[in-house]
Amino acid sequence: MAPFSFLLTLLLYTLSAGASVLESRSSALLPRAGSLQQVTNFGDNPTNVGMYIYVPNNLASNPGIIVAIHYCTGTAEAYYNGSPYAKLAEKHGFIVIYPESPYQGKCWDVSSRASLTHNGGGNSNSIANMVKWTIKKYKTNTSKVFVTGSSSGAMMTNVMAATYPDMFAAGVVYSGVAAGCFMSNTNQQAAWNSTCAHGKSIATPEAWAHVAKAMYPGYDGPRPRMQIYHGSADTTLYPQNYQETCKEWAGVFGYDYNAPRSVENNKPQANYKTTTWGKELQGIYATGVGHTVPINGDRDMAWFGFAK
């Protein structure tokens, strides 16, 4: 029996060692924690969008995800450095995905049919695949996936909420336009739309809701709660876009846009006005603030449910 016992011990050791090697190799494939890392193999990437990720040293078990989307002329690294999300990730344990636009001016494609359609093969599709990769690799909490962005990234935030409403629990929009407002009649990618930018694309809540819902035909499930920021002195994306964005989501959620539940002046700070239509929609209008409204990380954490 001794030879058999020896062989059994050797076999168990070999299997154990092999498992350790496989585990080590698997871990090595994951981005290093505590710094911004590029991911190049996240899956189908129809528009060659760059993926960068920040995994905190203090990663929670079953962590949440925030997708943080940069502005025109920006990069993933610039938004990583200029926004508070990586620092907040260390405090709350979530993962941050920083997509990077593939276009020369670094604006996002919020204009083509592909990007304005669920699984349509545009920028929105690439970003959604980044989220799916992260969920699979890190076993994240699928009920705690959020999206936010500034300027062009705010536009894409609205688009992501409309094209993938089943993916996100909430979104925060810093100085954007309504989803579909930049739609290109010639189906151009990342097209600029001066009519929309200047606040001249005006519609009813019902019409805007139709635009948003058409981005995922047939979908009738839950949609992300939306918080909309805009400044009264914005000369890039004119202030009327605040009204149109709020009208869009009020229409989507079935709120009466003209009868909000509450209007609070000087909240969350002086010269800001917070309008709440219901638990799914809140707008914050900043008097005297230009483009873009500064990110309020603590309020974002409260809206996303990471903090009270």
Swiss-Prot record:
InterPro entries: AB_hydrolase_fold, Esterase_phb, Plant_Biomass_Hydrol_Est. Keywords: Carbohydrate metabolism, Cellulose degradation, Glycoprotein, Hydrolase, Polysaccharide degradation, Secreted, Serine esterase, Signal. It catalyses: Deacetylation of xylans and xylo-oligosaccharides. The active site is at 151 (charge relay system). SUPFAM superfamilies: alpha/beta-Hydrolases (SSF53474). Gene3D superfamilies: alpha/beta hydrolase. It comes from the Eukaryota. Pfam families: Esterase_PHB. Its EC number is 3.1.1.72. GO terms for biological process: cellulose catabolic process; xylan catabolic process. Glycans are attached at residues 141, 193. One of its GO terms (cellular component) is extracellular region. GO terms for molecular function: acetylxylan esterase activity. Residues 1-19 form the signal peptide. NCBIfam families: esterase_phb. Belongs to the carbohydrate esterase 1 (CE1) family. AxeA subfamily. Acetylxylan esterase involved in the hydrolysis of xylan, a major structural heterogeneous polysaccharide found in plant biomass representing the second most abundant polysaccharide in the biosphere, after cellulose. Degrades acetylated xylans by cleaving acetyl side groups from the hetero-xylan backbone. Monomer. This is Probable acetylxylan esterase A.
